């Protein structure tokens, strides 16, 4: 069906007499508008798209959508809507013919565990013979389609374009991370989620949401705004999971590591060698064998098992998929050093994730007398209140700490570092303005059985500084160090 302005805005309340204008593309970036395109003006935190309406029209926009009254002396139609972000979502879904209506889509949200749960579920679905793509922090993981990492959840236009490409390439299943920003900004408003998953919630992104309550409300949308979903899987070991379970508007499956609920990890052994045990789901028992480590990963395995079961995946495929899902990029990735020490890279960047990762390493260390060296930092232009908290958490577990930049963005590195230092009670740390130097110092210090853990960046291959992406990789530095020695 030919894309027209009337078709793209179908179903948006309050709009009447929409002209049948052909539309050849959609963009929220006026500089990218080509003749025949629809321009949708978005008022963002840094830029107001309404100021660029004249540029969009000069570039040939066939129509413009805005939330404001706009005086236009030209013939270009200006359509006023109550919410431009919702309009982008609807227009993008219509333009690309609602690809998620034709696929099975799982949406996963939570402060921590989204990527690991998504990777586990993707592995399970592939073991069951389902052509599955994964969308999230790691980018788009799909055979034959390579997309760079960007936002955890892409903007609405990019998202529906990617989903359309995946559908046309024969993909039947999509596993998608849904960030709080995406939910708050209506980026996934017109995604047809068949199943949803809640991993956990802890204070994070308060620089954006303002309060933990608003952050929670954004996450809750995934469980209250999609009434056509088949089921929701909820980790009720987290206090916010219990609240969501009570609010959810679709059938729920509760998971727990500690209580006998819908799906539970009845007996488990978590060691440096992996996670083993039995997950009980009604009359079915799943034998779990995973090389992943940590209680937090056992929770992720539980969520992935639960949603797989409700999707109708067979027992063998679930067990095989979990067993085959080994190291997840940037999540507890380990590297052996020539000194006999071990380096670990993890994406952890919240207080809760720090606690879980560091406590797991401390608990599972072979040599209790060995040293733990932690290389870390905090992001600039983000929630400042957590910086001293994260410093205090690191001090609790580390023999020595190396405070370094981690995407300082437009803040001074020295200011961020000082706010981290405020959480320390002792002077068992060194401070660096260059992360590479800090990481190499830690690697040189480590001897047999010691652990060097670099937190925050995971598989990121850049430092975000002063509106630029500067090439940088913890993993490359560790690999180069190993080869040099």
Can you say where each PLM-predicted feature lies in the sequence?
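ATP-dependent carboxylate-amine ligase
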Residues: 1-14, 32-38, 51, 249, ...
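N-terminal leader/targeting and accessory segments in enzymes
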Residues: 1-90, 94, 231, 239, ...
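Acidic, Mg2+-coordinating active-site environments of NTP-dependent enzymes
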Residues: 7, 11, 70-75, 184, ...
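Phosphate-binding loop of NTP-binding sites
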Residues: 7-12, 87-236, 240-248, 281, ...
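Short acidic/polar active-site loop segments enriched in Thr and Asp
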Residues: 62-63, 172, 194, 399
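Short internal beta-strands
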Residues: 62-68, 232-236, 375-376, 400-407
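Short secondary-structure boundary segments
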Residues: 66-69, 178, 200, 236, ...
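A short acidic, helix-capping loop that chelates divalent metal ions and anchors anionic groups
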Residues: 72, 141-146, 204-209, 382, ...
């Amino acid at each position: 069906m030919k894309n027209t302005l009337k078709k793209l805005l179908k179903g948006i309340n309050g709009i009447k007499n929409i002209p049948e204008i052909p539309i050849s593309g959609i963009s929220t970036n006026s500089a990218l508008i080509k003749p025949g395109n629809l321009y949708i003006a978005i008022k963002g935190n840094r830029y107001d798209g309404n100021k660029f309406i004249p540029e969009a029209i000069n570039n040939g926009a066939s129509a413009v959508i805005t939330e404001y009254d706009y005086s236009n002396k030209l013939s270009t139609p200006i359509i006023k809507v109550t919410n431009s972000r919702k309009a982008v979502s609807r227009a993008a879904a219509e333009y690309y013919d609602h690809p998620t209506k034709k696929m099975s889509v799982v949406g996963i949200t939570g402060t921590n565990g989204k990527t690991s749960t998504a990777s586990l579920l993707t592995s399970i679905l592939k073991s069951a013979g389902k052509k599955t793509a994964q969308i999230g922090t790691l980018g788009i993981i799909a055979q034959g389609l390579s997309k760079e990492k960007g936002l955890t959840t892409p903007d609405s236009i990019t998202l529906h374009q990617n989903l359309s490409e995946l559908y046309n390439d024969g993909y039947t299943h999509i596993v998608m991370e849904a960030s709080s920003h995406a939910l708050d900004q209506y980026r996934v408003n017109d995604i047809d989620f068949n199943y949803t998953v809640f991993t956990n919630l802890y204070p994070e992104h308060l620089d954006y949401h303002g309060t933990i309550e608003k952050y929670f409300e954004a996450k809750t949308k995934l469980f209250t705004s999609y009434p056509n979903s088949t089921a929701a899987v909820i980790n009720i070991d987290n206090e916010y999971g219990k609240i969501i379970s009570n609010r959810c508007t679709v059938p729920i499956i509760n998971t727990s590591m500690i209580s006998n609920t819908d799906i539970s990890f009845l007996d488990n052994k978590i060691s440096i060698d992996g996670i083993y045990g039995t997950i009980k789901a009604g009359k079915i028992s799943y034998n779990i064998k995973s090389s992943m480590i940590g209680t937090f990963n056992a929770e992720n395995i539980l969520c992935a098992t639960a949603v797989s079961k409700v999707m109708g995946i067979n027992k063998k495929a679930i067990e095989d998929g979990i067993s085959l899902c080994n190291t997840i990029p940037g999540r507890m990735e380990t590297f052996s050093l020539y000194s006999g020490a071990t380096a670990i890279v993890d994406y952890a960047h919240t207080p809760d994730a720090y606690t879980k990762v560091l406590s797991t390493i401390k608990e599972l260390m072979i040599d209790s007398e060995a040293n733990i060296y932690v290389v870390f930092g905090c992001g600039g232009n983000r929630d400042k209140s957590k910086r001293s908290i994260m410093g205090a958490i690191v001090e609790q577990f580390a023999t020595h700490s190396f405070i370094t930049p981690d995407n300082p963005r437009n803040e001074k590195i020295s200011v961020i570092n000082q706010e981290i230092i405020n959480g320390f009670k002792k002077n068992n740390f060194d401070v660096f303005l260059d992360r590479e130097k800090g990481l190499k110092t830690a690697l040189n210090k480590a001897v047999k059985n010691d652990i060097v853990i670099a937190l925050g960046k995971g598989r990121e291959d850049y430092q975000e500084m002063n509106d630029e992406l500067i090439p940088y990789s913890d993993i490359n530095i560790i690999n180069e160090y190993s080869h040099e020695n």
